[in-house]
Amino acid sequence: MRSNNNNPLTRDEILSRYFPQYRPAVAASQGLSGGSCIIAHDTHRIVLRRHHDPDAPPAHFLRHHRALSQLPASLAPRALFYTPGWMAVEYLHGVVNSALPDADELAALLYHLHQQPRFGWRIALSPLLAQYWSCCDPARRTPFWLRRLKQLQKNGEPRPLRLAPLHMDVHGDNIVLTSAGLRLIDWEYAGDGDIALELAAVWVEDERQHRQLANAYAACARIDARQLWRQIRLWHPWVIMLKAGWFEYRWRQTGEQQFIRLADETWRQLRMKG
């Protein structure tokens, strides 16, 4: 269901106009991006998502809806409704753990995603990193950040190993263990890109866990494990800068201390690695 109303509505207006029998239940706790709430009617639940990023064009939010509309139920919740500024998606009943699932299970899930038809829009990290630099708190801009940004822009993004649809925000809180298996939620950063970029961006605990995931994926995809790991390492500097920039970006938007702590820790990691 899609509305043609071009004016963003409040949550109460959305409920009264399109979901009159539903009432707010609890805020969605998964992920760091916010902008979600759960609405309920009797035992039936729906996730209502708001376009919460004032610096992102409306087209990005529409892409999120299109990605969910395109993906099979074996990967993601169904898209139920869209109007400018809001969408409603299926609520997935299941268990959410902060830890990632077993490497073989996660590799199979990501390989299943990467076998799907492409979304139709490419993930471009260089302009995104530049946006984070320009939109962050000016007091947080450092010569170190600028040098790293210019070096990446000079080198250019790695040549893709394989192009596929990517989720690009894979961590424990975005994976639901349902009665039918693992599903991914929070697809707002989805787009087409290198499979190794997806693997580089997974929020792993350490290099050992990262290598286990890479080896398991290589077995699924019948790719040489050493070649895949080399490609993941090529993307690693981009991913670390992406995370640092996103934390800075969200700090400027929200003022929430968790983002500045995460940004500081990520910058420390970058400085230690030179």
Curated annotation (Swiss-Prot):
Q: Which reaction does it catalyse?
A: thiamine + ATP = thiamine phosphate + ADP + H(+)
Q: Which UniProt keywords apply?
A: ATP-binding, Kinase, Nucleotide-binding, Transferase
Keyword Endoplasmic reticulum assigned to the entry: answer is no
Q: Which Gene3D superfamilies match?
A: 3.90.1200.10
> The organism sits in which domain of life?
Bacteria
EC category: transferase
Give the protein family. Belongs to the thiamine kinase family.
Q: What is the purpose of this protein?
A: Catalyzes the ATP-dependent phosphorylation of thiamine to thiamine phosphate. Is involved in thiamine salvage.
The protein, known as: Thiamine kinase
Q: Which organism is it from?
A: Salmonella paratyphi B (strain ATCC BAA-1250 / SPB7)
Gene (UniProt):
thiK
